[in-house]
Amino acid sequence: MSNTVVCALYRFVSLENYQEIQAPLLKMMQANNIKGTLLLAQEGINGTVAGSREDINTLIAWLKSDPRLNKLTTKESFTEENPFYRTKVKLKKEIVTMGVEGIDPKRTAGSYVKPKDWNALISDPDVLLVDTRNDYEISIGTFKNAVDPKTTNFREFPQYVKDNLDPAVNKKVAMFCTGGIRCEKSTAYLKEQGFDEVYHLEGGVLKYLEEVPQEESMWQGECFVFDNRVSVNHKLEKGQYDQCHGCRLPITEDDKKSDKYQEGVCCHQCHEQLTVEQKQRFAQREKQVGLAKQRGQTHIGNDAVAQLENNRLKKQAVKQAQRVEAKK
């Protein structure tokens, strides 16, 4: 049974003292062995973390003890192993980066649509369905009839809207993303640009996969996630994709058969873009990861830091014992 809870969370709310929250939040996560990354900004909090059921409950309770975060949006899935190596709390200008000043989802945003009502909305021929995620995310799964903006990052989305959408033509626009947070900003942006009927999938794709039976689903493929699982299927279980360590893009078992694929180094998508030095560095890293696994250790992440410190202390103890023995 999968016993690690993966929890995606966010909340757009004014956090004037967000910088002061960083240290106690990080300490709290470390004390409860929670891994993952949370972003703090004046506009709110966002991130994905993983840990035991008890520890995740403790974290959520801690966050919601702040009245500003008591309506925190959370979505959960489950996995065998923790998909994160490190524990981080970062300070940011935005909790999801669009790069447009003045966009405030707290003030204006699109209409939320529950997962159970989503199929009916996107089946309306008058509705333009837009996937707000990046091209590499869309490549492994999306909703039937969704438009792919072909953006490589969320900063490119406003330009896509300016070049391709028109309030006079696109009377009804529905948008979706992985967990809902990007759509908070994308729908707010469209409203600011004069679009009237703007909708977005409440809770994102992850909530849809959780609540809509697979036999009724209009989702096609798998859903990309930003952790070591790479993708999840309709049951929210780890999907069939792995990740290239050279370019961080999803790859299939067939992709690994390419003569341009080298485990831990590169794939057919980045083989020509990486320098010789980069490939050598990645190959050395992969070698160290393999050696660490043979020793039953971790090469990267918080555990690796602890192991290095433990090894250092052991060496000190050995040297001290040798000095004591030499004096006899």
Swiss-Prot record:
Disulphide bridges: none
* Database matches in InterPro entries: Rhodanese-like_dom, Rhodanese-like_dom_sf, TrhO, TRHO_N
The UniProt record lists the Rhodanese domain at: 123-217
Annotated active site residues, numbered on this chain, are: C177
Q: Which reaction does it catalyse?
A: uridine(34) in tRNA + AH2 + O2 = 5-hydroxyuridine(34) in tRNA + A + H2O
- Record has Coiled coil as a keyword: no
Keywords on this record? Answer: Oxidoreductase, tRNA processing
Coiled coil, from the record: none
Task: Please provide the Gene Ontology terms (biological process) for this protein.
Answer: tRNA modification
Q: Does the keyword Transport apply?
A: no
**E.C. no:** 1.14.-.-
Superkingdom, natural source:
Bacteria
GO molecular-function annotation terms?
A: oxidoreductase activity, acting on paired donors, with incorporation or reduction of molecular oxygen
What task does this protein carry out? Catalyzes oxygen-dependent 5-hydroxyuridine (ho5U) modification at position 34 in tRNAs.
Q: Which NCBIfam families match?
A: PRK00142.1-4
PANTHER family assigned: RHODANESE-LIKE DOMAIN-CONTAINING PROTEIN 7-RELATED, THIOSULFATE SULFURTRANSFERASE/RHODANESE-LIKE DOMAIN-CONTAINING PROTEIN 2
Q: Return the similarity comment.
A: Belongs to the TrhO family.
- Provide the protein name: tRNA uridine(34) hydroxylase
| Taxonomic lineage | Bacteria, Pseudomonadati, Pseudomonadota, Gammaproteobacteria, Alteromonadales
Q: Which gene encodes it?
A: trhO
